[in-house]
Amino acid sequence: MNFEGLDPGLAEYAPAMHSALDPVLDAHLNPSLLQNVELDPEGVALEALPVQESVHIMEGVYSELHSVVAEVGVPVSVSHFDLHEEMLWVGSHGGHATSFFGPALERYSSFQVNGSDDIRQIQSLENGILFLTKNNLKYMARGGLIIFDYLLDENEDMHSLLLTDSSTLLVGGLQNHIIEIDLNTVQETQKYAVETPGVTIMRQTNRFFFCGHTSGKVSLRDLRTFKVEHEFDAFSGSLSDFDVHGNLLAACGFSSRLTGLACDRFLKVYDLRMMRAITPLQVHVDPAFLRFIPTYTSRLAIISQSGQCQFCEPTGLANPADIFHVNPVGPLLMTFDVSASKQALAFGDSEGCVHLWTDSPEPSFNPYSRETEFALPCLVDSLPPLDWSQDLLPLSLIPVPLTTDTLLSDWPAANSAPAPRRAPPVDAEILRTMKKVGFIGYAPNPRTRLRNQIPYRLKESDSEFDSFSQVTESPVGREEEPHLHMVSKKYRKVTIKYSKLGLEDFDFKHYNKTLFAGLEPHIPNAYCNCMIQVLYFLEPVRCLIQNHLCQKEFCLACELGFLFHMLDLSRGDPCQGNNFLRAFRTIPEASALGLILADSDEASGKGNLARLIQRWNRFILTQLHQDMQELEIPQAYRGAGGSSFCSSGDSVIGQLFSCEMENCSLCRCGSETVRASSTLLFTLSYPDGSKSDKTGKNYDFAQVLKRSICLDQNTQAWCDTCEKYQPTIQTRNIRHLPDILVINCEVNSSKEADFWRMQAEVAFKMAVKKHGGEISKNKEFALADWKELGSPEGVLVCPSIEELKNVWLPFSIRMKMTKNKGLDVCNWTDGDEMQWGPARAEEEHGVYVYDLMATVVHILDSRTGGSLVAHIKVGETYHQRKEGVTHQQWYLFNDFLIEPIDKHEAVQFDMNWKVPAILYYVKRNLNSRYNLNIKNPIEASVLLAEASLARKQRKTHTTFIPLMLNEMPQIGDLVGLDAEFVTLNEEEAELRSDGTKSTIKPSQMSVARITCVRGQGPNEGIPFIDDYISTQEQVVDYLTQYSGIKPGDLDAKISSKHLTTLKSTYLKLRFLIDIGVKFVGHGLQKDFRVINLMVPKDQVLDTVYLFHMPRKRMISLRFLAWYFLDLKIQGETHDSIEDARTALQLYRKYLELSKNGTEPESFHKVLKGLYEKGRKMDWKVPEPEGQTSPKNAAVFSSVLAL
């Protein structure tokens, strides 16, 4: 409402006028109103007022049910009945919001919305509440958590808001425009100009938007264009309030008089059918608020600020007998609202009290309200009391610190003796089956325990204490869960054992003796590691992705290219997919498909990993196609979900994976509809297994694949000819075959698993029958011999029985397009190639041979929750780059475990624990069809000046000078580097029984600031990069003491730093690495690990290792700077510019002391003196008040004199 022209003392609220009220001293406060209200020290009421026993509510007549204090002494500025729950929301002039539950007005929540401005409008949504202040729109949960905070322009003065639909909001005020805001993206989508400024009230019907102006006019606007259709000049002074119901519009306001503005007692009523005014309605109160209350009739409730309320019909006469008084505690009523059910009225006064009037003893605010979620009571667990009267009370209930001294309760040495544990009995089955030679027995190792590790458990103790154990000691009797001992060791889920040194003492070479790089598994959502490896070893995909670069912040193609580059550079060391998975978590489609797992679900294996990785496979191919498509078509840089997969010719990903099809729908009326489409992968469709299970019918894999590609099905579909849904025969025909055939196996139930198992048994019998006596019973080879057996040329090696078991999948398939749009698919063997000739010659006739390149497998293991691994056939180009040899070999990729395997192992699926999930077949000679050259897309322009994301950043706050064109770094140049980090997830650790701590999962760090300083030239030591990295993830610890990062520094809305994206800074560092600069810093190994960069060792000059002696502790940068440079750094917090500059100076000092590395013996003496001084000082730098720092000359002269 508008108070323009009124007495300023009544229209405005001055905080000084409303100090904290004392019920005894304030004459305006009704003592009976607050006699049961408990006030906290700040003067806020804590409980609602109970209804007096004498109050009697008459049905159909509004009477006061409850009064409650929202905030003592602070006027109520707005009230609103929640449209979804039984709640009443109240906002105050002090920016505080309070909610009350139910007609009893029990306090539900109370929180501060704005620290300086009053709350002007409240709107309830399904998931939260919208609060409008002067220039701020805040969306908060009903408990008080902020969902979003949208800052408007500082010059705006907003008064009204209108929710047009579930995701669109109109906001108006005293300016000459109305803003449209999209609540999904929290962005301004439209700004409508208003001819008459000052929109303080807005309403909506199914015909118009209604805008009430401070000039006294009401404008009716079109719902689509927002143009003025009609305008009512209601009052000559100002508009106070109006409401719309049906075809009537009623308004109250102020008229101009000789002495100023006066409240007009005539309500203006307009007929919206004829668009003209009808007879004004004279009332007996000074109207300030009005609302239609359409229950039985279209009644109007007219409220005055003094507390008088009158009901009347808008087309009749007002009756003075229909007036009742609200009895406000303060002198004025400030707000009024009606519930959606019309059973309750809410009034707020100038003293912070809220009055609830109802027409029934048990009213409801909404016709259909959902249940309200209440906070759980705070329960504090107390330690159980100890009863000292009990003689047998164990003293172990009292916690005592760990000590090595003798305790009073220790037994004397004379009364105790060591008793060795009895050896557990040998399993009876092992004793029965072992072979004896003399008195020595021999038995095969059942492989159920680790070497030299046997749990001590006696039989009698098992029955008494461990009867819940489900795993017996003997291998016999484990038929209930056979996979507990069937899973081969290399297929089990691998974990990293962390020590106090982190990953430095973990031997990754034990798990990977090749030069290929594995991927670390401890990152959230790292279940896709195996699929990343599959995509990497597709040579056209690897080259294409590494050539891609766009400006989108979270582009999966860009991040995957950066990760592929790291895998190229690595020489057997595992890599991390931090940045890729970070971008993956921001894609809305990934979350909608359920691909984002919680840490608890991923660790426990609650999700179906096979189904999950198949959905991820479909998602990543579609997303890469979109990312590449957006770069190649003219409309660049659209949103992540802005385009759908439509044509295979739009991107190279489409050319590789896309299969063009024709979908034919034939109705029984004879009409046929043909629609062209494309797909990036196929899903296996299995035949009805009910008969095959009994008869053992043989299905070739090629038959099942053809049935899945050329799918025929009967379904109900719309027929345009019949104009109704009819039974339709839908047929899918292939028009163009893909270069890479991707197949999701969809083995999601025991039915599909039994089908694979049955077909493997039938294939085994046929293979044994085919080869006859040529099959050897056992053929074992050393691991190094598999390279020679992988793909012998010109020689057919007869397989062994073990190699034929559980095999149904062919290594090659042959596909041919027929003239009648059909497809022929058959299994292809090496013998077929010798008979029909090479596949290359037949491609001219539309015949293609696909070779199996990868299989992704789900490992079932209840102990670890299962895992995903991949068998990948690594091509010649990869071996040439990594090992300098030219051959092909199958490998097992299990996170950071990489091991060469026989090719038959890649197609052997024991359905008890090894279930196929995804298959990749590639056309033979695929690499020759594509350009495999990689051109680095990162240019020197990434180092030039760029704008900051922070709104409040000013040029005076700039802490660095960007490089000029004549300063571009060259190969061998020095660059000082330092990075600061924040913590996203805390470390998970457990305390062992011996008191040592074991790290289960390390803390997840994220880079927050990266600084690079010039290492030579006239500007040496001046930073040219000092980027703060904006993050959208929740930070649990800013580590301010060690990083210097404060809350708000990484928020683009309030930060004053030079804020940029991680991708932007990553590109700068990648360019410096690619050009060959040398980085100087302290502890760079951790910095590059968190940033997710792989840097060649000859480009890293780490002072933590330059000033280090073997088998000695690492020395901090602070101590080195004090000892060698007489500098005291890192006083209160760390500063990355200071640390990078100090590391450069230390490197110069290292060159000076070691004579550029030519005198290692003299430098060794310096290091000995450093360590001796450090031990004496306990490695602590003296405080300024204490002893002075030793001067360089004195320190080194004493060292050199040794």
UniProtKB/Swiss-Prot annotation:
WD repeats lie at residues 153-193, 195-231, 244-280, 328-367. The modification Phosphoserine is found at residues 791, 1189. Binds 2 metal cations per subunit in the catalytic exonuclease domain. It is found in: Cytoplasm; Cytoplasm, P-body; Nucleus. Its EC number is 3.1.13.4. InterPro entries: Exonuclease_RNaseT/DNA_pol3, PAN2, PAN2-PAN3_catalytic_subunit, PAN2_N, PAN2_UCH_dom, Papain-like_cys_pep_sf, RNaseH-like_sf, RNaseH_sf. Its cofactor is a divalent metal cation. It catalyses: Exonucleolytic cleavage of poly(A) to 5'-AMP. HAMAP family: PAN2. This is PAN2-PAN3 deadenylation complex catalytic subunit PAN2. The lineage of its organism: Eukaryota, Metazoa, Chordata, Craniata, Vertebrata.
